[in-house]
């Protein structure tokens, strides 16, 4: 056996190990009851925002009105917290963290939890949005997907996309946008779980945070978080509409990461 064959033989178990870890990650993140519950809750919040628009004949109006004219949007952070944000608290409560730390370092354990929560937060919000898009023809059978019936609900930076009827890009933009916010809401709930040992507080804190930031934004001359979640401002281009939320939610997610690592390492030393 030559040197190249030996290298291939040695690399095969490593590749299988990586594939196994990826499969476990996908299974524990997406194929769970909590992920399905979070996606259904997200879809339900969209539907609640459209309760007064049952007679609408425009698909685009139904989709836009579900967030633009709805007060239920403050419940969206709970959806991102459903799949994985409580895992850290449950591991501590059941003393599973002690068993996990026998096989890996504290830093790796906390990083894995944080990444899984961020990915699941993005995915559950995106899945809920896509599920709502699929339910619109069922809940609103008279709604027609046409630019001619947009009724002033389209933001200027997406006007050309809607005129070309590139609906994949149009709805994909909003799905990506709500997914970005889902990353932050998920890791925020995870960070709270490292400091607070109460399930209700973990779920309620992101809602209160969103409401408080929206209340303070006009006084601080800033864009509100809910406005950035759904691009409710008149940006010049779609790149700006995507960049502002990315910077805002990304920077706050970094702060959550630092707070979670600090408290998580301290909790692991005390356990």
Short names for language-model regions:
Residues 15, 19-26, 107, 111, ...:
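Alpha-helical membrane-protein architecture signal
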Residues 1-91, 194-195, 211-271:
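Hydrophobic alpha-helical transmembrane segments
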Residues 86-120:
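Helix-loop-helix units of permease transmembrane domains in multi-pass membrane transporters
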Residues 47-86, 114-194, 230-248:
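Secretory targeting signals
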Residues 41, 111-112, 124, 205-206, ...:
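Hydrophobic core positions of alpha-helical segments in small-molecule transporters
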Residues 97, 144-146, 266-271:
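Short, Lys/Arg-enriched, Gly/Pro-containing loop segments at transmembrane-helix junctions
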Residues 116-130, 200-234:
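Hydrophobic alpha-helical transmembrane segments of integral membrane proteins
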Residues 105-107, 198-203:
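Membrane-helix interface segments
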């Amino acid at each position: 056996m030559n040197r190249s064959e030996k290298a291939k033989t040695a690399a095969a178990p490593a590749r299988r190990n990586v594939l196994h870890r990826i499969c476990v990650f996908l299974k524990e993140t997406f194929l769970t009851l909590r992920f399905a519950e979070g996606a259904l809750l997200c879809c339900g919040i969209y539907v609640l925002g459209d309760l007064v628009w049952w007679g609408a004949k425009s698909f685009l109006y139904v989709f836009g009105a579900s967030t633009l004219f709805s007060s239920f949007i403050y419940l969206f952070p709970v959806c991102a917290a459903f799949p994985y944000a409580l895992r850290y608290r449950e591991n501590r409560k059941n003393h599973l963290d002690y068993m996990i730390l026998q096989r890996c370092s504290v830093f790796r354990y906390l990083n894995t939890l944080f990444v899984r929560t961020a990915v699941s937060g993005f995915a559950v919000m995106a899945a809920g949005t896509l599920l709502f898009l699929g339910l619109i023809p069922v809940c609103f059978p008279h709604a027609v997907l046409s630019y001619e019936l947009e009724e002033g609900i389209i933001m200027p930076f997406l006007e050309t996309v809607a005129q070309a009827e590139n609906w994949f890009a149009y709805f994909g933009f909003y799905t990506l946008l709500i997914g970005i916010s889902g990353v932050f809401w998920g890791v925020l709930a995870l960070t709270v779980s490292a400091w607070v040992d109460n399930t209700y507080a973990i779920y309620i804190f992101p809602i209160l945070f969103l409401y408080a930031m929206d209340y303070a934004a006009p006084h601080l001359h800033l864009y509100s978080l809910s406005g950035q979640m759904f691009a409710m401002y008149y940006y010049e281009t779609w790149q700006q509409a995507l960049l502002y939320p990315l910077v805002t939610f990304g920077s706050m997610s970094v702060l959550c990461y630092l707070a979670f690592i600090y408290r998580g390492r301290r909790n692991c030393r005390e356990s």
